[in-house]
Every structure is written in structure tokens, then in C-alpha cells.
Amino acid sequence: MQIIFVSNYINHHQLPFCRAMLSQNDGEFIFIQMEPMEQERIEMGWGLDVKELPFVHCYNEEPEFCQNLIDQGEIVIYGGVEEESYITPRIEAGKLTFRYSERIYKEGQWKFVSPRGLKKKYHDHIRYRKKDVYLLCAGAYVASDFHLIHAYPDKMYAWGYFPEFREYRVDELMDFKDKEEKIEILWAGRMIDWKHPDDAIHAVADLLKRKNQVHLTMAGGGVMEAQLKQLTVELGIEKSVTFTGFLSPSEIRIKMLAADIFLFTSDYREGWGAVLNEAMNSGCAVIASSGIGAVPYLLQHGKNGMVYRNGNVKEMKEYVSQLAEDRNTCRRLGMNAYETIRTKWNADTAASNLLRVIRSIQTENPEAAPDGPASRAEIIAPGKGYAYTRK
């Protein structure tokens, strides 16, 4: 079959899924890049040379060719693009289409009552509820957002982002982490308010009052970086914290391999959070906020990670202290996290599951995957994600 994947731009989070589709699909697969990557993302090491990827076509270079593929392609996956006019003719014509989307109410579901917002949601989504269009939910709370506006009834599937899976022997993976006596804690991302990097620093400051053998690496940069460095000085922990600046994706993976604990402190504005996939793949014991879109899909509290209630820094600190004192639990959580990515939440599984779903829809017998990518998206309200990880 012919599959056209349309998104804002190709990056290292999309590339493994594209390669899996190229490998598994028995027909043509094309990725259409709709816009150049932002400079900030390029500086973060996200840039790829599209000229080295023959399946990628850039809309700004081949507009007529690309638009024809969007209009006439057998199956189109469309997401990450704000402008709706590119896809509207296709949906109105009743051609099989998959939208993929992060949350539409990241700032809070109370916003769905806005008349102006509802008008746009009707135009973009609700009016197509009976058309041949399905939703791939890139985050556990996406289905809840769209359920509020009665869009995509019984046509929503669990989805996400699928960074490169790297295979390791479990003993090899744990050996990386046993090279240092100190407990190594890693935080990685843009240093902006809704990612709450200061929570990681406060947690380690509390831990250092009781345990000397701890080190925190803050990987990334952003508007809060200077403020965070000053905070470590004020708390007297600057010798125990290293700021690396932005690192390439490969360099981040190296840091993850060495880390015992990965702290993921974002709130509900983190639509997915692909660093979670990467940290789990690297065998880290993850401590993550329940507000992060990927968390209810990927983590089971106490089995393959620790999940604290969004905004509850006290609970997060308790988990940091608990794991810092118990390396065996760190290793158990890390090994189970690795297995979650190896067996379920990876690009190959996502491609295989989605292709089966597409074929089932084409034969007018829609059937979701039993679990993981392309399974039925449960309606998980944002306030229920914490409990969901404890099922």
C-alpha cells in the first residue's frame, strides 16, 4: 500500500518509525516535510540532512508534487502541522486519513468551553466525526481532550514517538551504571518553566544533606540556565552539579547509560516526552511526573519506574531518596524499563501494529492492537493519570 506521512519536519524521533515503515510496508512510503526546522531545535542537535533521506520530500521545494500526494495518496498520516488547508480537501473527499496529535488542551481542559476555540475544533475535527479519519493519540491524555468535544468516536488509537531503540545485554547495560560509586542522577531538556528543572536541583540538595555520594547532571539549556546555576550556589551544592549545555541526541544517550536515576519533572504541557523512551531504553530508574503525556502509557509505578503526582515535589523527593539508598531497586526498575521499550514501545512494533490496523480498516473490520502502540486509546482524564499508573 502507499503511505504518505506528513509532518512539520523529519527528526531523530520520527526517523526510526519511518525506517520501520519502509522495511515493513509492502508498498511505497513517503515522508513530506512541511517546514524547515526551527533554529533552536537545530542547536539542540535535532537537525538531519534530508538530502541523505531519499524518502523525504520538502513541501517548500516541491509544492505541487507534495500536495498531490496529500490529496490522492492511498493512506495519509498527518500531524504536527497547524495549517489545516493542506489536508481538508482529502478528508472532505472521504479518503482514509490518520491524524496524529498531542493534546489540544495542554493548558487545561477548562479551555474547551471557549466558543471561539470550539468553533475552530468543529472546523478542524468535529465535523469529520463520520468521515474515514482516525486519530493517533501522541500522549495518554489526548483521547480525553478529544472526547470532550465528541470527535473521533471509537476511532482513537494509542500512539506516541519512537526514538531509536538500542539493544543491549542486560548485564552490559547495568555494567555501565556500576562504574561509579556515586549515585548519578540525570535531568535533560530545555530549561524552561513548565519543565521545572529547579525541582531536580532542590531534590538533590535535600538528598545531599544525608548522602554525600550523589552527583546531578543537568543536560540542556534555555532561559532558566543562569538562574539554575545560581540556585546551586545558593544551596551550596555547585560542586555536586554539572551543567553540560545542549548535547546531541547521541551524547545524551551516553549520559543516560551512566545514570542510575533519570528525573523527568515536566507538567501537563509535556505532550509526550521522548526522553522517557530513551532513558528507559538506557536502563535508568525513572522518576517522572504524572502530568507527562508518555507516562501513563510507558510507566507502571513500582514496576518499571516511579510516578509522582504532577506538582507534588515532596513525593518526588521521597522517591529520589528511596532509590538513592537502594541500588538494587534502581537496577530492577531499569531492567524492566528497558524490557518495556524492547518488547512494546518501539518503532518496529508501532509500524507493525499500525499496518495491521490499516489493513483491518480497509477490509471494513477495524481491529486495534491488543496493547501498546495502535491499541484502543483509553479515555484517561489528566487528573486520573496518577492512579492509572498504579492499576
Task: Cite the ranges covered by each PLM segment.
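Conserved donor-binding/catalytic core segment of Leloir-type glycosyltransferases
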Residues: 176-195, 201-204, 217
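Short hydrophobic beta-strand element within catalytic cores of glycosyltransferases
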Residues: 285-289, 299
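Acidic donor-binding loop of glycosyltransferase active sites
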Residues: 257-271, 284
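Short alpha-helical donor nucleotide-sugar binding micro-motif in glycosyltransferases
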Residues: 246-247, 254-259
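Conserved acidic donor-binding segment of nucleotide-sugar-dependent glycosyltransferases
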Residues: 300-302, 306-313, 321-327
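Membrane-proximal helix-turn-helix segments that form the acceptor-binding/catalytic region
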Residues: 115-135, 144, 148-149
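A short, well-ordered alpha-helix in the C-terminal region of glycosyltransferases
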Residues: 315, 322, 329-343, 350, ...
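Nucleotide-activated donor-binding/catalytic signature segment of Leloir-type glycosyltransferases, i.e.
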Residues: 53, 229-247
